[in-house]
């Protein structure tokens, strides 16, 4: 099952987007609908709201007077926090009940207005945000919903900012045009990203990663940050640390080329723990690559952890690897044991390249040569670079010793 988090500011067009995804075959779990359901007459949700805000938020028939509640709940941050503290847990519980009844190969679209505000974005393998600028949203709310302009602006101001939404968005859909434009874009996202992602997950297979070098993308750090947050949630306390590694982590150097693949390292206590994370990582969108179980061993292996420093044990180069099923964001997830030489070098390599222009230039030359010789074949590209790493490993540790590097 693929779970998608769908959100957007009030008036941005979230309802149209969720309807389109439903027509494409998604099972939509609407946060607004659930929020109304959990405060129906006779529910614990409505009773809690009355306790918090008073009986004057009720209509004559005992149902919730939403305008009366809004007048109290949106007047300040404290009141809004009380409202969210009552409604959000009840909605989450009802959502979990619905999802538990869904078949394993489905695409569940969770329409959550306050996805960002509630900190739920990392729970989803994919987050889709629909956007429209503030003035357009105000106009829609006034003209289409009959809302007073002051009320519309207050509602918008009470929600997350565009910057906060961009930070969690894997897919950003602009809805400044016609409804037909949004529907077309939404269907394209479904056909080219969502559906292939869901298929890959169901088959426990990864998305094909690009093998060609491309110019540095300034958005790589932000993309990696979303993935790191997602993996921290998926791994929980079993992840000792989660780091952006590899060439895409060497940011701030526009001339430094890399494959458009984000590499992440999850540090664990043991390979047994890494194996325990196979299913949680699959649920997060990262199937395991069973055929990759170790890095290339280096002689006189180094580590800042004394018992692993200056060792020659092949076992200390073992690891587990997962990769993304999402065709829109190729990602490798390396699970390595704390203190083992391969775990240490993955962290050191990024810092060494960032601090040493000569090392970056050397590595770029090697990568470009490997790229030409591999002609788009990823395995050949990786193999072609490996001899350079034997020398680079020693050079990096010489630098680490000189600057007293610590991970």
From Swiss-Prot:
Species this chain originates from: Mycobacterium tuberculosis (strain ATCC 25618 / H37Rv)
GO molecular function, one term: dephospho-CoA kinase activity
NCBIfam families found in the cross-reference section: dephospho-CoA kinase, PRK03333.1
Other remarks on this protein: Was identified as a high-confidence drug target.
EC main group: transferase
Compartments in which it is found: Cytoplasm
The protein, known as: Dephospho-CoA kinase
Pfam families referenced in this protein's UniProt entry, alphabetically: CoaE (PF01121), GrpB (PF04229)
Domains as described in the record: The C-terminal UPF0157 domain is involved in the proper folding of the full length enzyme.
Region named UPF0157: 211-407
Catalytic activity from the UniProt record: 3'-dephospho-CoA + ATP = ADP + CoA + H(+)
One GO term describing the cellular component: cytosol
